């Protein structure tokens, strides 16, 4: 991945994290890599564990970043979340949800989609 693209992605993830922290969520871990998938942000929202996918698109002509979280991507995220929970058994009993932060435009405008999909939808 080109350096400029990596830098843009890191900046958008940092902005997404700041948005969620302003809303009261707390970071558990960022950029957790597991076989077959990466979790951009894992956060706590009260007693819930939130797996956050951050997607950036320069423009939203084709549905923006959220539209790119198709069934294949959702399945990878669910698998990564299962592996995360297996590695962190103390968190495994918490209710979980999957959120998406969609970013588009220059400068990026963020939209937080709470409970964007469920594990059993995949």
From Swiss-Prot:
**GO MF annotation list:** nucleic acid binding
Looking up InterPro entries in the UniProt record yields: Restrct_endonuc-II-like, tRNA_endonuc-like_dom_sf, UPF0102_YraN-like
What domain of life is recorded for the organism? Bacteria
Q: Which SUPFAM superfamilies match?
A: Restriction endonuclease-like
Annotated NCBIfam families: PRK12497.1-3 (NF009150), YraN family protein (TIGR00252)
Which family would the database say this protein is a member of?
Belongs to the UPF0102 family.
What is the name of the protein in this document?
UPF0102 protein XOO3839
């Amino acid at each position: 991945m080109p350096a400029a693209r990596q830098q843009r992605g890191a900046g958008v993830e940092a902005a997404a994290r700041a948005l969620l922290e302003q809303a009261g969520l707390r970071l558990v871990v960022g950029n957790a890599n597991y076989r077959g998938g990466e979790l951009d942000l894992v956060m706590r929202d009260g007693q819930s564990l939130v797996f956050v996918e951050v997607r950036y698109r320069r423009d939203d002509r084709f549905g923006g970043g959220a539209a790119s979280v198709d069934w294949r991507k959702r399945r990878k995220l669910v698998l990564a979340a299962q592996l995360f929970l297996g590695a962190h058994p103390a968190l495994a009993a918490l209710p979980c949800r999957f959120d998406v932060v969609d970013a588009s435009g220059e400068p990026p405008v963020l939209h937080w989609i709470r409970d964007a999909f469920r594990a059993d939808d995949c």
